[in-house]
């Protein structure tokens, strides 16, 4: 298996399963989503040992049905109409009068991931801090939209972040023309912080707590 920050099998001598040469083969691997290197994020490749060096002989493949491992198995909500509109909380009454049942919310990681934040979240053995007041603003907006039966799509944005530079791809430089940047999963540190942020959002806004509401996409 190869994690997102691994680019090749060079130097690797470990493997998840082994089989003798045959016309076809299949592997069954144990799954533990609580392990440090979550297998859902890995890509898998078949390799052969040639002179002590493992060489790939297949394409790389990902797990194609990760949803079956989710703790949250509620059905996707059905909207009463197809009508959608990008709205702010102050526009909610107008949106309801128009029959709006879909909207998108920009979720800026830079705004709520705060090393001095009062809201803590433990993930994979590490504690992350979030800006409590900013998160509560998201809570209010998402809750009020959800309570009106509006299906929410979250647009997760990665702005320039000097407090968490690991979220930025190595070598990228801040520009005056770019507001947002690609999330970095090419390093272990960036990958871990990205995992933590996405896990926090998924746990908070999965709809199980009415105080937070639900982001469906």
Regions found by a protein language model. Give the residues of each.
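Beta-strand-enriched, solvent-exposed domains that form extended recognition/catalytic surfaces
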Residues: 1-71
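Proline-rich intrinsically disordered, low-complexity coils
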Residues: 4, 30, 39, 56, ...
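Solvent-exposed loop and beta-edge segments used for protein-protein assembly and interaction
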Residues: 21, 36-40, 77-79, 146, ...
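Extra-cytoplasmic beta-strand recognition segments
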Residues: 27, 85, 150
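Boundary/entry segment of secreted carbohydrate-active catalytic domains
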Residues: 30, 41, 54-109
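Short linear motifs in intrinsically disordered
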Residues: 34-37, 71-78, 119-123
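Residue-identity detector for glutamine
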Residues: 35, 73, 80, 179-182, ...
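Substrate-binding cleft and catalytic face of glycoside hydrolase catalytic domains
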Residues: 98-217
